[in-house]
């Protein structure tokens, strides 16, 4: 049987810190920099956002290796192995990926979205009228 609980945000955060008999929690994360490290580090033992409590010496070793390697392909390979291990051991189940849509009137120019999905407003302006 599955029981879904709807909670106020403050209560959810408290439950997340001490899940008790809870088997599954919804959790989202937005990268603060453009690198797989922004997501993979979340599952390291001792990371403040490791709400799953996941611990793996192999995972830690793969992430440690990726941080020491200067060659981009080797670094990516170590990160892929870490990600595969994480998915195989299932402390996390990817359910959805957030997508944002942006609408702008035709007379606005300079509309740009950063690789992190944020609206870059620096160059927004009205097009010159002819």
Can you annotate each of these PLM segments?
Residues 10, 15-130:
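Detector for C-terminal structural segments
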Residues 1-7, 74:
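A local structural motif
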């Amino acid at each position: 049987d599955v029981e879904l609980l709807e909670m106020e945000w403050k209560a959810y955060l408290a439950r997340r810190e001490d899940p008790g008999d809870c088997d599954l929690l919804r959790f989202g994360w937005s990268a603060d920099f453009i690198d797989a490290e922004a997501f993979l580090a979340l599952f390291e033992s001792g990371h403040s956002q490791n709400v799953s409590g996941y611990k793996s010496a192999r995972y830690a070793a793969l992430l440690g290796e990726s941080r020491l390697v200067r060659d981009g392909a080797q670094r990516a390979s170590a990160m892929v192995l870490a990600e595969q291990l994480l998915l195989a051991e299932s402390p996390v189940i990817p359910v959805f990926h957030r997508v944002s849509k942006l609408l702008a009137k035709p007379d606005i120019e300079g509309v740009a979205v950063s690789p992190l999905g944020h609206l870059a407003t620096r160059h927004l302006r009205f097009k010159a009228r002819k």
